[in-house]
Amino acid sequence: PNARLIWAHSGIGGAPVERVRALLAKYPKLMGELSYRPGLTDGAGGLSAEWKALLTAHSERFLVGSDTWINARWAGYEGLMNEARRWLADLPEPAARRIAWENGARLFGLPTPAR
């Protein structure tokens, strides 16, 4: 019950928002990581409406990820972070800040970066 778990991709197969919401309710220490997340964004790179609602309501439970699991993926890191900045901009500023860095800092016991 005290274990903290980071759920890679918040479901790599594109788990429906309802499923993600149910698992967050069932497991209070579950954190959703948001790299390679089908359905997260709309066609223009902004957040889909259902994910915007979920991330706004549960911003303390998600964190940005990059999915740089092999060295070759680091070549596209800047682009990945630019994509994340694009959809983070669709959230209220406090929620975006939590997802972008505060939740990760808290999870790993690091000081919260100054704004």
Protein language model features and the residues they cover:
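Alpha-helix capping and helix-coil boundary motifs
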Residues: 43-47, 69, 76
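Residue-level detector of flexible, active-site-proximal loop/helix-junction positions
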Residues: 12, 38, 69, 103-106
